[in-house]
Every structure is written in structure tokens, then in C-alpha cells.
Amino acid sequence: MSRRTLAVVAAVALLGAAPLAGAQQTQADREKAAAVNAELAITYLKQDNLRAAREKVDKALEQNPRSVEAQMTAGFVYDRLGEDKKAASHYDQAVKLAGKDNPDALNNAAVFQCRKGDKKRGEELFLQAAASPLYRTPEIAYMNAGNCARADGRPKDAERYFRQALARRPNMPDPLLQLAFIQHEAGNNMQARAFVQRYHDAAPATAQSIWLGYSIERDQGDAVAAEEYARRLRMEFPTSVEAGQLFDQERKAQ
């Protein structure tokens, strides 16, 4: 626990021994106590103590239900508890309370919706976060919106968002790789090849990126380039799923 948290906990504990200065002071004390309990809930969540995390976040909400941090923390906690309806409700409440002034609330709610809820809604929230002048990394929100749209079976929308991410950070690895997949799946292998090359210039190769490069060159009929990718896959990622797929493919071809 941080020194700041300990200090606030001590201050809240002392309130029981001191007379309150009126309703305004009481509200201020509740807000401070809610902030402490929300922070403690996160600490317990990191320790996988879900029961304690739930107790603390419920207390925080009781003390200050209009706290964006408490509502977001409740979203985290109930998500981990597998209570998706409650988690969604708390994320939505955080977004309503924060408006456009807290892109983090928008982003957190969007991540949840894309993973467990309404992907279209998640995509909309990511775009709202990207449009916020307070969000310093809109390219991340565009990338996430692209991943959400792709998971929802809308590659054209995904491509648009990935390109918007690259317009802000041209060497951002994940959008480059995702665009390579989208172009390969659409049969545009020349564009797919270019995106794979840009990805390998921007980030270390992965089993996934090498396998994609191999698949592109194989489809293009470039046996030499395909074999070079196959060699790298065997050497650099021998235990990967992709290396297993390559082995199965080569065995069937014999």
C-alpha cells in the first residue's frame, strides 16, 4: 500500500474520534474514504483476493456512488468475479459520470464490451476515447477499435481504424500485422507482403508473423521466399503452434 493510501486511511480512522464540522465536511470525508476503499479494492484485486476487493468497492460505492473511480473499480471487480451484468452496469455508470472528460473510463468500458458484451458498442466507445482532446494516445483507441471490428467480422471497418492508428504512429506494430492478415484474407498478397515487411522492420518477428509471411509467399508461388520463412519458423520458434502447422503441412505434402 502506498504512503498516500496509508495517510488517507489514518485520516479516515481519526474521523470517528473527532466531531464533524457539518454536512459539507461529512460529504468531503465520504469522498476521501471512498477513494481509499476504491484504491484498496484494486490492491486486493491484484492479490487475487476477490472477496476483500468486493467488500471494499461496495463500501466505496456506498460512500460515494458518483465517483468515477469507484464505478470503474467496481467494473474491474465484478468482471473478475464473472458477474458480467453488474460489471457492464458499473462501466456504463462510469462513462455517464465521466462524460468526455475521462477517456480512460471510455477505454475501460470499451475493452469490456468488446471482450464480453456488445462489440459495436465497444467500438463506439473506443472512437469516443480517440476523439477526446484529453487522450494522449488516440492511436491505441483506434487500434483497439480495429481489433473489436475484426473480431466482429467486419474487416473493412477494422482496416479503416487500423489505418487511422498508423496515420498517427506509422510504425505501430499491431495495426501493421492486422492489416497484413486482412489483406492476405482478401487475396491482396502484394499489399499483405508489404505490411509484413513493415511489421518486421518495426518489431521483432513472432511465430505468427513468420507463419503469415510463409503463407503469403506460398500463395504467391515464391518457393524460395516461402522456404526461408519456413526455415526461420523451425529455427526460431520450434515449439510454436505455427511450427506444428508447418510440420503437418509438409508431412501431408510428402
Would you name each region that the model predicts?
Residues E39, T73, N107-N108, Y142-N144, ...:
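Canonical tetratricopeptide repeat
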Residues E31, P65, G99-K100, L134-R136, ...:
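Short coil turns that delineate tetratricopeptide repeat
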Residues Q25-A33, D201-Q254:
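Terminal, low-structured helical/coil segments at or just beyond the last alpha-helical repeat
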